[in-house]
Amino acid sequence: MSGKTRILFFLTCLSFLLVFPTRSNGQDLALSCGTSEASADQDKKKWEPDTKFLKTGNSIHATATYQDPSLLSTVPYMTARIFTAPATYEIPIKGDKRHLLRLYFYPSTYTGLNISNSYFTVEANDVTLLSNFSAAITCQALTQAYLVKEYSLAPTDKDVLSIKFTPSDKYRDAFAFINGIEVIQMPELFDTAALVGFTDQTMDAKTANLQSMFRLNVGGQDIPGSQDSGGLTRTWYNDAPYIFSAGLGVTLQASNNFRINYQNMPVSIAPADIYKTARSQGPNGDINLKSNLTWMFQIDKNFTYILRLHFCEFQLSKINQKVFNIYINNRTAQADTTPADIIGWTGEKGIPMYKDYAIYVDANNGGEEITLQMTPSTFGQPEYYDSSLNGLEIFKMDTMKNLAGPNPEPSPMQAEEEVKKEFKNEKRHAFIIGSAGGVLAVLIGALCFTAYKKKQGYQGGDSHTSSWLPIYGNSTTSGTKSTISGKSNNGSHLSNLAAGLCRRFSLPEIKHGTQNFDDSNVIGVGGFGKVYKGVIDGTTKVAVKKSNPNSEQGLNEFETEIELLSRLRHKHLVSLIGYCDEGGEMCLVYDYMAFGTLREHLYNTKKPQLTWKRRLEIAIGAARGLHYLHTGAKYTIIHRDVKTTNILVDENWVAKVSDFGLSKTGPNMNGGHVTTVVKGSFGYLDPEYFRRQQLTEKSDVYSFGVVLFEILCARPALNPSLPKEQVSLGDWAMNCKRKGNLEDIIDPNLKGKINAECLKKFADTAEKCLNDSGLERPTMGDVLWNLEFALQLQETADGTRHRTPNNGGSSEDLGRGGMAVNVAGRDDVSDLSSEDNTEIFSQIVNPKGR
């Protein structure tokens, strides 16, 4: 080979390596299944074809017919390997090493296949990872388009990792599929874990096979796999969606130049960014002693779980300055005479460490939930009464070589749709066969009808549904459209809990109460239909929302609102009394809100103008309602349609958030967002949500920012009659604020009546809500606190101050000990119903270890 040829060959190889990085240790492998060519994902990671590793079994390769917008990369999701019989991959490994295994699933439409028929088992060597698994049902339940399952496989005596896919024999035409397989050799990061509730007993995690359930950057932002440590490409998610109760505490952040010193553990345990942020209870020790930080997670019961808590102190430097108790499912992990003391464990600040705790979860100990609670300890009379956490990982341990949990159960409505689909297929087949033999057709038809009636009986039964399922009736993945009309022909199918929590009205009752839906009783019109003023039980005033059969909103939104509102009770959320779903009509019955919508009092109205103080109080009430949805309910709820017509006011000027037909449950165990069809109202719609079709609670924050400017300026969110730059209120107000002439566009009725400091605080809050990046927007807790503070400033200026903000902190960034502090608002206890008080404060405020 000539010198020039060698150089050309070297440069060619070098360019290839730059595009496709080599395996870091000779043991890492990423397979793009169903493709014949090497490719790279968005992070330039190389994905190889899977063909040479597929050793047994017949298979076909397929390409998805639709690319979901939530897919960050087509690799490895758009191609798949399909198995109609058992098949095995054999991947060479170093058997004496632990390995990360990731399985990538995209349950899309593949030509000639019905993804709902895909049920299969996956085994890695002798460990069952998935059993009778349906990626379609799981993604539908999680309201996302794709799924990644991650496992940490213990060392073995085999130098080959055999991954076997077996279609289920319980379903006709069942098949298995896989889009991507990733195998990464990793150092041994596990040892023993203290068994919670048992003194001096441990679980051996070093020999265990584990499934990664949750991996959280507590108090910080998402950390993508490309920024992980040790080459393990793990993704760390923000913890806020998993915080239970309204108390978010404060988020802490070390200064940029703060150094993390890995003295006592390998860097691959967690990246430095995990230890540079934290969440603590806050600066008020008196409040902290009466409350705690609580996280809640949904898991599979009858397994042992390892909770790895990451700690690093970057503020304090002495022992006994901050000590705290740790409880897991109300059992003591660290408390009494051995509370947690980070400096006591590490010796100095800047040194990261972790603690592993193991707990077995069954019906008698948590059921399908794990709660982690932290509260200050008074043992030793520490200098500060506080607790803090930097990171959290939760792993499921294998039981008798099994890690497989059940598929989530479909909602009653989803189950009914499956029955309808199957019954139609059965009728079609019966008709075809009938053309060949009438007697046989009658027999088959009878059998089909019997099966159908049995399945309908199941629908009416008490169907246990996994508690982390999305709100019933919502679209399951982006690109999915409802096939259910707006007319209810067969009645709704609600969970027993929802049906038991609200009243079911007969259609004659509704017609009598609204004078047969007389137009003179119409008090509003929305996307769902008309809203009527009515009377029930002789004297009780109600609002009745009647569906319009031609509306785009239909059964989905109807059931969503019932399932959601029947379980929520809060001073600042409109109360659902009951519903009616008979005679082809769908009606929702609410408490009557005497003063109507907020918008009615802002512009295009003959009603008296609202004072600035009253507007602030209404904004605060609405913020409390949204804050409760995001953090105070059992699971994060995203409203998705926040606007001034969905904020109602009662006769005492108490604001209540309404209209939950588009609401969705928030981020789940596999990500920090929900992938969904974009819905909402133009003018209020979060542009980031519109672009990415990824929904978070920060989308509500954006919409609320528009509401705040609407309150201030008394003009619509969109006004096409104005010059182009003024059409969007959000854009126009932001532009005026940046130029320093915001006062020129505020409501003329308010000019000269708003304290300057109050106006600045209010406008700054609205501006932060409208940040282009959701990550940079405040939480609703932050918004609530700032609005309370703005009201305090106004009352001080007016000489009418009679209340203080609900928490003693500040939502501003404060320089303190080389860190930034962000205080989240704490909602008023008085805003919760007695039921809420009992549930939250009996379990959260003062947990008792067992």
Curated annotation (Swiss-Prot):
InterPro entries: ANXUR1/2-like, Kinase-like_dom_sf, Malectin-like_Carb-bd_dom, Prot_kinase_dom, Protein_kinase_ATP_BS, Ser-Thr/Tyr_kinase_cat_dom, Ser/Thr_kinase_AS
MF terms (GO), sorted A to Z: ATP binding; protein serine kinase activity; protein serine/threonine kinase activity; transmembrane receptor protein tyrosine kinase activity
Source species, domain of life: Eukaryota
Region (Disordered): 796-850
SMART domains: S_TKc (SM00220)
Disruption phenotype: No effect on male fertility and pollen germination, but siliques slightly shorter. Anx1 and anx2 double mutants show defects in male gametophytes due to premature pollen tube rupture.
PROSITE patterns for the chain: PROTEIN_KINASE_ATP, PROTEIN_KINASE_DOM, PROTEIN_KINASE_ST
Signal peptide segment: 1-26
SUPFAM superfamilies: Protein kinase-like (PK-like)
A GO term from the CC aspect: apical plasma membrane
Catalytic activity line of the entry: L-seryl-[protein] + ATP = O-phospho-L-seryl-[protein] + ADP + H(+); L-threonyl-[protein] + ATP = O-phospho-L-threonyl-[protein] + ADP + H(+)
Domain Protein kinase: 517-790
Enzyme class: transferase
One Pfam match: Malectin_like
Keywords, comma-separated and alphabetical: ATP-binding, Cell membrane, Fertilization, Glycoprotein, Kinase, Membrane, Nucleotide-binding, Serine/threonine-protein kinase, Signal, Transferase, Transmembrane, Transmembrane helix
Residues bearing attached sugar chains per UniProt: 114, 132, 292, 302, 330
Residues annotated as transmembrane: 430-450
Function of the molecule: Receptor-like protein kinase that controls pollen tube behavior by directing rupture at proper timing to release the sperm cell.
Record's protein name: Receptor-like protein kinase ANXUR1
UniProt source species: Arabidopsis thaliana
Source taxonomy: Eukaryota, Viridiplantae, Streptophyta, Embryophyta, Tracheophyta
